Amino acid sequence: MTQPLVGKQILIVEDEQVFRSLLDSWFSSLGATTVLAADGVDALELLGGFTPDLMICDIAMPRMNGLKLLEHIRNRGDQTPVLVISATENMADIAKALRLGVEDVLLKPVKDLNRLREMVFACLYPSMFNSRVEEEERLFRDWDAMVDNPAAAAKLLQELQPPVQQVISHCRVNYRQLVAADKPGLVLDIAALSENDLAFYCLDVTRAGHNGVLAALLLRALFNGLLQEQLAHQNQRLPELGALLKQVNHLLRQANLPGQFPLLVGYYHRELKNLILVSAGLNATLNTGEHQVQISNGVPLGTLGNAYLNQLSQRCDAWQCQIWGTGGRLRLMLSAE
């Protein structure tokens, strides 16, 4: 019988020696050539000398974890397909891995090798094993499950909140939030676009009933892709966030989510020291040390068919932004390293 993975090179990045050996044996039995790494540091050294067809990667590892490894390779333009196999129970880690472009996430313990085989084949042969129709059907099922279970949707949203302090795109970011402990209020999301720039948004989910939570989950899933698309089509190096918010407003209507969705979106480029902010219905003040600016709050998304927005741009290497609305208050702080 022909071995299906003959000619394929698989990089296995796993700190547990027994599980690493099991994966090595399993892939070898399918004909693949395997290369082994105990953590992200070893993997980066190996990736300097070859490009695998697929990387299998754990999240929790010594010296350099899987998320840091993914950030390194994506920032240098490496789009090697990655399948994460991890024992993590942290939804934020899973969400970050998916945002960094992994093909899929499989949770340990791996009990179904047929499922692993299907996922590996889908990574290596996407045109044969990935169906757009099936992906859309899965998406609709997941969306319907969130609509039918508001408590689960709110719990998921809470688990996806970013850590209160982190270093991202070589910037130190932290925030403080004052909201009711028993319900969602202001939802913050922040993510690196490259090693030099990042984007964030703050959404007040309290003015649209359960649709506020659903809008937050939808926005989290789509935001990075929308902004990357904006940047790809811009001749200049900075995005037009007003156009982005108009696109979000349109998507909320397409998703049949009525209500008001106060939203503030920001973008920061570390090398250019340029901060861009635009608000649709949230109050905010910006302090750069030299200047304090009141941001025009505008009209919440969902109120009108079109969003009419003013974009604020400031040059600074450190700043604080106070944001407030019906859902509470939040202070976001950034300093470039």
From Swiss-Prot:
Residues recorded with modification 4-aspartylphosphate: 58
PROSITE patterns, per the entry: RESPONSE_REGULATORY
Effect of mutating residue 214 to H: Resistant to IraP and IraD
Segments traversing the membrane: none
One GO MF term attached to the UniProt entry: transcription cis-regulatory region binding
Effect of residue 58 to P/Q/R: Lack of phosphorylation. Cannot bind RpoS
InterPro entries xref list: Bact_response_regulator, CheY-like_superfamily, PPM-type-like_dom_sf, RssB, Sig_transdc_resp-reg_receiver
GO annotations of cellular component type: cytosol; protein-DNA complex; sigma factor antagonist complex
Induction section of the entry: Expression is induced during stationary phase by RpoS.
Residue intervals of the Response regulatory domain: 9-123
CDD domains linked to this entry: REC
Effect of residue 143 to R: Resistant to both IraP and IraD. Increases stabilization by IraM
Keywords, ordered alphabetically: Phosphoprotein, Stress response
Post-translational modification (record): Phosphorylated. Phosphorylation stimulates the interaction with RpoS and, therefore, the proteolysis of RpoS.
Disruption phenotype: Mutants exhibit nearly constitutively high levels of RpoS and are impaired in the post-transcriptional growth phase-related and osmotic regulation of RpoS. In exponentially growing cells, mutants exhibit significantly reduced levels of polyadenylation and increased stability of specific mRNAs.
A biological process from GO: positive regulation of proteolysis
Domain of life: Bacteria
One Pfam family named in its UniProt record: Response_reg
Activity regulation details: Under certain stress conditions, activity is inhibited by the anti-adapter proteins IraP, IraD and IraM. IraP is involved in response to phosphate stavation, IraD in response to DNA damage and IraM in response to magnesium starvation. IraD and IraM interact with inactive RssB, blocking its ability to interact with RpoS. IraP may mimic RpoS in its interaction with RssB and directly competing with RpoS for binding to RssB.
Domain remarks: Contains an N-terminal receiver domain and a C-terminal output domain that are both required for binding to RpoS. IraP and IraD interact with the N-terminal domain. IraM interacts with the C-terminal domain and, more weakly, the N-terminal domain.
UniProt function note: Regulates the turnover of the sigma S factor (RpoS) by promoting its proteolysis in exponentially growing cells. Acts by binding and delivering RpoS to the ClpXP protease. RssB is not co-degraded with RpoS, but is released from the complex and can initiate a new cycle of RpoS recognition and degradation. In stationary phase, could also act as an anti-sigma factor and reduce the ability of RpoS to activate gene expression. Is also involved in the regulation of the mRNA polyadenylation pathway during stationary phase, probably by maintaining the association of PcnB with the degradosome.
Family listed: Belongs to the RssB family.
HAMAP family with a match to the protein in the record: RssB
Oligomer and partners: Binds to RpoS with a stoichiometry of 1:1. Interacts with the anti-adapter proteins IraP, IraD and IraM.
Official protein name in the record: Regulator of RpoS
Organism per entry: Escherichia coli (strain K12)
Gene that encodes the chain: rssB
